[in-house]
UniProtKB/Swiss-Prot annotation:
The coatomer is a cytosolic protein complex that binds to dilysine motifs and reversibly associates with Golgi non-clathrin-coated vesicles, which further mediate biosynthetic protein transport from the ER, via the Golgi up to the trans Golgi network. Coatomer complex is required for budding from Golgi membranes, and is essential for the retrograde Golgi-to-ER transport of dilysine-tagged proteins. Residues 270-510 form the MHD domain. It is found in: Cytoplasm; Golgi apparatus membrane; Cytoplasmic vesicle, COPI-coated vesicle membrane. Signal peptide: none annotated. PROSITE patterns: MHD. The gene is ARCN1. InterPro entries: AP2_Mu_C_sf, AP_mu_sigma_su, Coatomer_dsu, Longin-like_dom_sf, MHD. Belongs to the adaptor complexes medium subunit family. Delta-COP subfamily. This is Coatomer subunit delta. Gene3D superfamilies: 3.30.450.60, Mu homology domain, subdomain B (2.60.40.1170). Keywords: Cytoplasm, Cytoplasmic vesicle, ER-Golgi transport, Golgi apparatus, Membrane, Protein transport, Transport. It comes from Gallus gallus. It is a peripheral membrane protein. One of its GO terms (biological process) is Golgi localization.
Amino acid sequence: MVLLAAAVCTKAGKAIVSRQFVEMTRTRIEGLLAAFPKLMNTGKQHTFVETESVRYVYQPMEKLYMVLITTKNSNILEDLETLRLFSRVIPEYCRALEENEISEHCFDLIFAFDEIVALGYRENVNLAQIRTFTEMDSHEEKVFRAVRETQEREAKAEMRRKAKELQQARRDAERLGKKAPGFGGFGSSAVSGGTTAAMITETIIETEKPKVAPAPSRPSGPSKALKLGAKGKEVDNFVDKLKSEGENIMTSVGKRSTEAAKVLAPPINMESVHMKIEEKISLTCGRDGGLQNMELHGMIMLHISDEKFARIRLHVENEDKRGVQLQTHPNVDKKLFTAESQIGLKNPEKSFPINSDVGVLKWRLQTTEESFIPLTINCWPSESGNSCDVNIEYELQEESLELNDVVIMIPLPSGVGAPVIGEIDGEYRHDSRRNLLEWCLPVIDAKNKSGSLEFSIAGQPNDFFPVQVSFISKKNYCNIQVTKVTQVDGNSPVRFSTETTFLVDKYEIL
């Protein structure tokens, strides 16, 4: 079989997308496709027509044709089989068999066509392999990116928490009439300057310019007491580094205390048997209340680095009362899991894979029950003259959770300037480039389960939706845990470590 070209065309012969597998000019392929409708005989049910030089093998698809142009000595049976594969590929990338949809996904189709045919000859591939090849999906890359993003979020959350502690310490010192920490040892002539510098002035970091904002000016004087300790300098350098990478940090005017600790979270101490428990939530709520849809997916990934612990069983504790659906891996003994809540292989003599992440249990929860929402967000915009007063509240309904690095993103009207902030729990950032107000909360837990933000800006109520939320938690929502690991032979306990992550896939208030 020698395939010259594959094309999707209209019934009038107009080419929408065409891929030539041999050298052929544009004029030549357009001429062949333009002549194709005139050669068809509507009185016969053949799916091919021939000319003196080429053969057309075609299949109608609603108002379009899938056409293969081959040499006359090609195998017609192989041509028809290849045509069926081409026809099955198109619906994989196009939702409708229409000209606009085909044009929009033309490059995806061309890439898929190249996987089917190479240099005019059919490749031995099926539909699933074509999808895999074109997506170029890499599980290792996804895992690496997820781990890196988690570490970055934890570092930022820890930095914000330390900054908040320093601000609170300065406020307490001012309230008691003492000097702010980090400014001791001033002479009498420098007391007033030190007090002024110690005042907490919240600033809005705008991202209109890509240049890094200069560091706040520091008090100068001959006294040696103005020098900070080494730890304070490390924290300053870390914050400056984050700014240079484009991260907008809420800062206070004045020096940081020497009590600042190391910001980066310590690495997880992985045992030879390590479990990763990950959950992702996708949630959509209405602005007037009510849960439109909530879907949560979770998985336990097992990683074994020592071959002597490859034949083990995991003891799972499921305290979920919401009706979550559980599903074990096909190689896991389902009867053992149902009867004793243990995860083990069907064949006890076999071992789990070594040095690779293996998904052994996954679960799914889908609901429209409003009481299942972990974090409720209420946004109340009200027009007041030429401006709009917006009040946003959050409340943690699932008090067993501790949400870290919470960011509530409120869209703003463009071209109206920065919002005027009233009362706020936590911190905020105004991203003028993306027209967003980001409400940042380092931690939301049972002790800090509710808060509010008030601001004013010109606009209409619809301008402030959809509100989006992101967070991360080290405690999973469905409360499914591995409590014990034992060996198959002898039932002796095995040391193991666990890493739990609860992430947001989509969290919107429309």
